[in-house]
Amino acid sequence: ETPLAPVVGEETLQDPDAGRSAIERQMDALRESEAPETVDPAEAKTGIAALAYDPAVAPAKEYALNSTHLELVFTDIGARLKQGTVLVENGEAQPLVPEHPGVEEDEFPYPLGLEFQKSYLGDALDQSRWTLASQSDDVIEFAIELPEPFHARIVKTFAIAQDHPNVLQVAVSFTNTRSESRVLGLDQAEAAFALSWSPNVHSGDEDNRMAQQELVWRDEEINTHFATSKLEVQPDNGYAKVMPALDWVAIKSAYFVVAMKAEYEGSSAWAKGVPEAFEVAMEVPREEVAAGETLTRDFKVYLGPVQGSSLEAAWPGLKSVLQFFTMFSFMDTFAKGMLYVLNWFYASIIANYGFAIIFLTILVRSAMFPLTLKGMKSMKKMQKLAPEMEKIKEEVGEDQQEMQKRMMELYKERGVNPLGGCMPMLLQMPVFIALYRVYATAFEFRGAPFLGWITDLSEPDALFMLPFSIPVPFTANGIDSFNLLPILMGLAMVASTKLMPTSGPVQNPQQKMMMTLMPVFFSVICYNMASGLNLYILTSTVLGIVQNYFIHVSDDEISPKPGKSTKAKSGAKSKPRHFYAAAQARKREMAKEKRRDKKKGRAGKGQD
């Protein structure tokens, strides 16, 4: 059976049958099907033509329906949503339905249309004029009387939900005005009709690198996320994606989502089209409607931000649309935990997400402090073992196996963990990765200001724009603005490396080069990232410098563990010194030794 084309007038198409109208070809397709409708094709053609919208007769009319969070405008052509705008708490108005000035009402696929797929009606009702049946502050109702041979009355009711300002309740009623019963849907696999949303979700975040739109649906307590970039029309059925037996389906961008939920059993959904312009529809299963009876099916439509509290209040399970990581569930849970803490700081301490980020950084640094202290001690112990390690290298030469064995014995004897200094950095990597996603895609940070020039924590902190663009690797789109936070972050990292203990009295040239280039490389990588992430890294680096300054690590010689070697000599312990001061003292001692060696050398030559 061939799905109907969207054309319902006498327009001809450029194909081998171009001499015949689209409706005539649709009629032939239905005659050849196994279960055609029991109506006369000629009468159906006349009835559809009578429904067609003619702008010359009267222009389309628009009707508004508003809530505290939504501004909706409906057109009487198709009884569809012409404009849908979400009102954000900061006063911003974000349209989710694009405007198309100059385009006739019946030529654009506006959302919330009806489709009778393998019926003579097809989507003809979307190009037909409906009558305004009733209107109040929060409810609007459209109706259409179908002439012979269809004999039906269809009513579409739109109402703002009383318990949620971002939820639109939709009811579609089909009244059979025939003298006998009728079946909507040609066979068991055929839907009665479908309520559609198209085209896509236009939420103004298309420039966001992580704003790839997704189809999300819930099937038997399992959520599926499907990137719309993978949509591909299947030649066997014309669909791009079929989603059987689901509870709800959603189209999600980075910050906004449109979700449709069926309030009846046996719902399914499908998607048609290409990634740039696709249509998603919720299907009503095949039903028999007795003479004079009415079939009513209810839907809920959520139009709003991808924000946990708003999604959770809409209906159970919709909050699962919020997902930062689709492949690693533990990272998604961790990222949501970070967002929860940030929201708590915002709601409980100060209503500024910039300060919430600073508080989170302090919390993470405090939690990591014991490991940081242990890591610093481990690095200092490694520093003091450097002479003995050099001695082992000289003794074993090129025998790597023997050298590794001797090194491990030395570590064990002196109680040193060679990886201890790396643990704090490794443990912070999940935090960094999680916050990278949170700051770039969480709705809470969209347009959230901090101080001064930082007006959007989800975007780079452009102090001013450059009159040119510099193509720099690892910066995505190059450098076209002066972003201050990553520069300050790089300077703070340079200062931090100056305070880090080295692995020996004289730093390895490769290590020195790495320590010099790392701040520069990191600043370049983070240059065009969200300012919220750069604020976190800058604050963490500064706190690390403060920690290093006040942490005093004992400068005593490392003694073997009791029972492994001689016991430490008794006596007064040397006064603990900051490891940076101790390193500087050692450098001064080495310089003095070099000067003494030079003097001895000159004295020896004089005697000769």
Pin down the residues of each PLM region.
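Membrane-interface starts of transmembrane alpha-helices
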Residues: 349-356, 360, 480-485, 511-514
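Residue-level signal for the membrane-embedded core of alpha-helical transmembrane segments
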Residues: 358, 426, 430-433, 521, ...
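Terminal, Lys/Arg-rich, intrinsically disordered segments and adjacent short helical elements
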Residues: 1-45, 208, 373-420, 467-476, ...
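Conserved catalytic motifs of ABC-family nucleotide-binding domains
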Residues: 434-494
